[in-house]
Each structure stands twice: as C-alpha cells, then as structure tokens.
From Swiss-Prot:
Main location: cytoplasm
Subcellular location: Cytoplasm
Species, as recorded: Oceanobacillus iheyensis (strain DSM 14371 / CIP 107618 / JCM 11309 / KCTC 3954 / HTE831)
Additional facts recorded: There are 2 substrate-binding sites: the catalytic A site, and the non-catalytic B site that may play a role in the transfer of substrate or product between the active site and the solvent. Alternatively, the B site may bind allosteric effectors.
Entries under HAMAP family matching the protein: FumaraseC
Designated name of the protein: Fumarate hydratase class II
Keyword Lyase: yes
Catalytic activity, as annotated: (S)-malate = fumarate + H2O
GO molecular function, one term: fumarate hydratase activity
InterPro entries (alphabetical): Fum_hydII, Fumarase/histidase_N, Fumarase_C_C, Fumarate_lyase_CS, Fumarate_lyase_fam, Fumarate_lyase_N, L-Aspartase-like
Positions bound to substrate: 97-99, 127-130, 137-139, 185, 317, 322-324
Similarity annotation: Belongs to the class-II fumarase/aspartase family. Fumarase subfamily.
EC number: 4.2.1.2
Top EC class for this record: lyase
Length: 461
C-alpha cells in the first residue's frame, strides 16, 4: 500500500495515499480499534450540512474568502451525495466529545476543497482547523450535528412510517366497525366490543406517539453552534450562531434556531433524552400492538384465531404447513433494542461533568439506531402484516357466543350477585347463560334475549 505523510501537533504519521483524511483521523483509527460500529452516516452528513453553513456564515461576516467558502461547500456537497463514504472510517468508540469525527470531516473537506481550488486556478489553500473549523469547536459542532441528524431522521423517516401504519389502522377500524367480538381483560373474557373499536385503540396509540415525537422535535431544533469550547463563544463572532442556524434552516428547509443557553447545550443532552423517550413510548405501543395481533391470530385451530394475517414464509423447519407471526416477532425484537438504547442514552446523558458531556457519540449512535429500526420495522409490519389483517367471522362468533361475560348486561336488571350466580352455574354445568338464567328462575327466555344483545353492548345508550 502506498502512503503519504501527514502531520499534526503530535508529529508525522503515515496515511494511505488513496484516502482523503489527515493525521488526526489516522491517529484515531489506530488508537481506537474497538468494535465495528462506525460513526453513523447521518452524523457525517449532518456535519457536512453544518460545515457548509459555517463557511457561509464566516463569509457573510467577512471572516472568509468567497473561494474558500465555495470550496468547503463543494466538498460538503460531495459528502451529502455519498461520493466520499469511504473516507469516514472512525468508530463510535472514540473520544466522548466526538472531536476525532469532527476532525475527520474537517480533514476530508479540506482535502477535497483544496483539489477544487487547484482546479479553479486559485492560490488559496484550506486548513482543516483554521478554515473548515473556523469559529467552531468540536464541543459545539458535535452536539449541533447530533440535533441536525435527529431532526432529519425523525421528520423524514420515523414520522412518515408512523403515519403509514396509522392510516392502515384507520382503514381497518372503519372496515371492521360492525364486527362484534368478545373483549378481554387480564387475558380473561370480558364484555363485547367491535373489532373496529379494538383497532381504534391501536390507531389512537400511534396518533399520540406522533404528537409526542413532534413535540420533542421542537427542543431538538435548538443548536449548540456558537458556544465553541465551553459555551462562552470564544473565537466566534457574536452573530455567528444566528447566521449558521439560518443557513442550516435554508439548506434543509427545516426550522433550526440558536440555543438560548450554550452552557446548557454543551453539557446536557436532555432534549435527546426527551425525544428518545417519545420513541420509547412508540416502542411500548408497538409491543402491545404486535402482541395483540399475534395473540388474536394464534391458531389456526387451537388458539384464539379471531383474525388472520398474511402467510409470508414457512414458519418451521420441522413442522410442515406451520405459519408464524414473524412480522410481530421482528417488531417486538426491535422494541427490545429500543428499550435498551433508552437505558444507554439516559445513563450517558447523566454524565455531563462541568462544561461538557463526553458521551456524545454513544448517545447519537443509539438514538439514530432506534429511529431507523422503528421506522423500518413499522413499514415492514404495515406492508407485510397489518394491511392483510382480516376477521375470522366464524371464530369471532363462536367465541362471542361462548363467553360468560355477556352476563354483565344483566346487572341493571337482576343485580350483580344474581348475574354472578348465572355465570358460575353456566360454567360449572357447561350450559348457556340463557339456559341457566331460565333454570334459576331469574329470567324468561324473552327477557334474556331483550337484555343480552352483544351489538347493543358495544355502543351502550
């Protein structure tokens, strides 16, 4: 392999000749051979958005030549169109401020930008620190990149997926609104409801999650940029932060604002904890929905079997003809991972010592992983399971007629204790509620039919 020699304040170091990174990236690559978890591409692209915006702000403030700004923006755009993916090799497990990934971006943008400047016939030369990182510190750029990446991921990936499944449930709710089935509480038979009503609960869960995620976005829109090293803004123009946030907003077509208190935004990640809490809430709802679906579809002959779901693949390597609720199982595993990520994020966010939290990369990694897993699993569950949910009318009717909890409708007419007598005796004798009520002399057949109407029980007057 051919090498070139790069140097930093530590000294000289060999860098592969075909790579665009510099000395600090190479040192990090050698010093942290830990795991396979690369710095998320969403963070790298967020950095690219940030760097092209800081260059614009520095130019507008008279702190940078136009050619240098354009060179940085050209290089940043190459990152955004995935042309430079191979030049960002660093793992998550590095310095807790993300300094080495900030420098990785600075070095690559300087390298590519300098090639562009040469092609333009310019004598100017970009320096990773003095130009690409001008008016910045890793301490304010990394949390800024975290928030940019989080907002983009939630708005462009998670919320559209959530809306897709929510719309499917709205359609199923309407289609099944008149199918009366038995309800269940404590895993035991309860009073009737319609299948549409049951699914309406799932729909409302997703509506609430959508609202909570959207609310959390407002806090993530605050950016730390301009705080530099400890929050004071040393070496940054007083108007730098506002101009950068405006440039980011214009470029992304999304709202971003300068954080009110930069001391807070460097050492605290409560906004990310809050936003991931909303994702955890969504995950909890998805666990409930996925479990309900697989229980209701259990069988086909010896389970509840009140709905059918698509048969996407063979379910067993030993039992012929078996079909399993695999989409539900995938969702529940994703939920498990998200719950674990939430614990990691919460602990990491609690470790802000003095002016800086140094758990930033692991917070970003887990947040973005949760977001992507949730979005992917929601879409997969929707397209390969939810849209294909259909009622099993025969089983629904059988379970409804077999339920002893229809006796609840008799409470206003014969009292709770007499209704309980009917239910207990019917269960013991394996007889129907009507037969038992008549046998006990508590009701006539006509009275029973008048009082016990499952359809009317689902919409009581």
């Amino acid at each position: 392999m051919d090498y070139r020699v790069e140097k930093d304040t530590i000294g000289e170091i060999q860098v592969p000749a075909d790579k665009y990174w510099g000395a600090q990236t190479q040192r990090s690559k050698q010093n942290f051979p830990i795991g396979n978890e690369k710095m998320p591409v969403e963070i790298i692209k967020a950095f690219a958005i940030l760097k092209r915006s800081t260059a614009e702000a520095n130019f507008e403030l008279g702190l940078m030549e136009r050619d240098k700004m354009e060179a940085i923006q050209y290089a940043a755009d190459q990152v955004l169109n995935d042309s430079l993916t191979d030049h960002f090799p660093l793992v998550v497990w590095q310095t807790g401020s993300g300094t080495q990934s900030n420098m990785n971006v600075n070095e690559v943008l300087a390298f590519v930008g300098n090639k562009w400047l040469q092609e333009q016939g310019s004598d100017l030369k970009l320096h990773p620190n003095d130009d690409v990182n001008k008016s910045q510190s890793s301490n304010d750029t990394y949390p800024t990149a975290m928030h940019i990446a989080a907002v983009l991921k939630l708005e462009d990936t998670v919320l559209p997926a959530l809306s897709q499944l929510k719309n499917t449930f709205a359609e199923k709710q309407s289609a099944f609104e008149n199918i009366v089935k038995i309800g269940r509480t404590h895993l035991q038979d309860a009073t009737p409801l319609t299948l549409g009503q049951e699914i309406s609960g799932w729909h409302r869960m997703l509506e609430k999650s959508e609202t909570m995620i959207s609310e959390s976005l407002e806090h993530l829109r605050e950016l730390a940029i301009g705080g530099t090293a400890v929050g004071t803004g040393l070496n940054a123009h007083p108007d730098f932060s506002e101009k950068v946030c405006k440039a980011i907003s214009t470029f992304t077509n999304k709202k971003f604002i300068s954080a009110k208190n930069k001391f807070h935004s460097l050492t605290s990640h409560d906004e990310t904890v809050y936003a991931h809490g909303a994702l955890k809430g969504l995950a909890a709802d998805l666990m409930k929905i996925a479990n309900d679906v697989r229980w209701l579809a259990s069988g086909p002959r010896c389970g509840i079997g009140e709905i059918t779901i698509p048969a996407n693949e063979p379910g067993s390597s030993i039992m012929p003809g078996k079909v399993n609720p695999t989409q539900s199982e995938a969702v529940t595993m994703v939920v498990t991972q998200v719950m674990g990520n939430d614990a990691a994020i919460g602990f990491a966010a609690s470790q802000g010592n003095f002016e800086l939290n140094v758990f930033k990369p692991v917070i970003a990694y887990n947040f973005l992983q949760s977001s992507q897993l949730l979005a992917d699993s929601i879409i997969s569950f929707d397209e390969r399971c939810a849209v294909g949910i259909e009622p099993n009318h025969e089983q629904i009717e059988k379970n409804l007629n077999d339920s002893l909890m229809l006796v609840t409708a008799l409470n206003p007419h014969i009292g709770y204790e007499n209704a309980a007598k009917i239910a207990k005796k019917a269960f013991a004798d394996n007889s129907t509620l009507k037969e038992t009520a008549v046998e006990l002399g508590l009701l006539t057949e006509e009275q029973f039919d008048e009082y016990v109407n499952p359809e009317e029980m689902t919409y009581p007057k």
